[in-house]
């Protein structure tokens, strides 16, 4: 039978519940247990697909095409179990489901209320999510409850967790509470009062945490841990210090050293094999002892909030580990390139243009593409980054001066990139879309496999085929492909059913390393294996740096 660990947060948001939950999962998996994770989001949006990156950060796409919270990306990077749509749900989905049942008459005329109908639905979603785990029936399901204790939005989820713990019985569920212990510089000491109040608030709801994870900018002294233990009614050995570190991949070892997995296994009456964290130690060792160093420019419009590119940043870190190369990421606002030109890119070893939506900043990104192509600097364009690379090539090489995307200019006569109006989803069903379709849930989403053109750089990187995840509405227009290919551009991968361009590149006679991909490879990168595309990109950046150094010598 699956046992449950509920992870809650207090004092402030953004303390790292997702990292803490994923790290615990990694330790338990290293002990031979089958583990899955779920994220419960209290907002009323059905999913984060239409939310601003400045408010929500990255939208992580699962293999089965769900638009989910970025924490699911952490889950997949820390454990081997793949996440699905059922691993993330929101208040919006819960209410949508309950209202649908009420309209059908499932409640037989009863007054539908938060308790029991909403809380029962939350419990059903949790159990369904755990049961759908790709690892089979999990030994442990770790359930992260979004928001902060005390928020009105989180109350139904916390109440559902309390009820579920009671229903499952002793040793079937436990609670881990992540809280903040701030350092007050003027007083020169850590303050435990916020943690005491947070735990008190949680206990008022009827939940007594079994373990406290205390976030601070430094290790918490024993005296402060004893005080927290006394006022929170949590055993002293269950007050765990979680201080700031320079890599999230150090967290599993930190938590294991303080006995978190032992406490959880004891509470849930589990007796697995000892933890083996040698892989994590090796990853950290490689990350901290690189042999080389490169600087990659990431050109986007969300650079003020790097959470918008969380998986992409981590994918570059994974490539750093597996190429023994420190990757410095320089964030460049594309709108500044429109105003000031591309002189600020001259020192970069490679240029990356990530995915995005909307017209703002696109001409600055196109200028970055042009610079990378003409200066022979390695270029990787992801999703929108590929589309803009095609537009730049069409304008500046092929001579289609009005080439554009209908996303930015619906009236352009040279629609090099246009809306996909019909395509097949992962189940083989035809999906249709128009300019008037709803924004939510109308994109091409999820993992799709396609063959790669032999003899291309793409084949050297991936092999015979590629299986990656998508999140987009627009595609390169096949009507212009013959002109683009005549100019030298290579379409190196296409979807087998709709014949949609998936990858483009420039031949080695035109550029040493220039690749665009319509999919999002960052979603499948893990620290264990890295990702072939990002490893190749970092190696190309290093080669560019060495070529420049040789030319100067």
UniProtKB/Swiss-Prot annotation:
Catalytic activity: UTP + L-glutamine + ATP + H2O = CTP + L-glutamate + ADP + phosphate + 2 H(+); L-glutamine + H2O = L-glutamate + NH4(+); UTP + NH4(+) + ATP = CTP + ADP + phosphate + 2 H(+)
Activity regulation (UniProt): Allosterically activated by GTP, when glutamine is the substrate; GTP has no effect on the reaction when ammonia is the substrate. The allosteric effector GTP functions by stabilizing the protein conformation that binds the tetrahedral intermediate(s) formed during glutamine hydrolysis. Inhibited by the product CTP, via allosteric rather than competitive inhibition.
Pfam families: CTP_synth_N (PF06418), GATase (PF00117)
GO biological process: 'de novo' CTP biosynthetic process; pyrimidine nucleobase biosynthetic process
UniProt KW keywords: ATP-binding, Glutamine amidotransferase, Ligase, Magnesium, Metal-binding, Nucleotide-binding, Pyrimidine biosynthesis
UniProt: Mg(2+) binding residues: 71, 144
EC numbers, comma separated: 6.3.4.2
Residues that hold ATP according to the record: 14-19, 71
Domain Glutamine amidotransferase type-1: 295-547
UniProt cross-references to PROSITE patterns, sorted A to Z: GATASE_TYPE_1
Cross-referenced InterPro entries: Class_I_gatase-like, CTP_synthase, CTP_synthase_N, GATASE, GATase1_CTP_Synthase, P-loop_NTPase
Chain sites annotated for binding UTP: 13, 191-196, 227
Quaternary structure, from the entry: Homotetramer.
UniProt family annotation: Belongs to the CTP synthase family.
Protein name (database record): CTP synthase
Organism: Burkholderia mallei (strain ATCC 23344)
Organismal lineage: Bacteria, Pseudomonadati, Pseudomonadota, Betaproteobacteria, Burkholderiales
Gene of this entry: pyrG
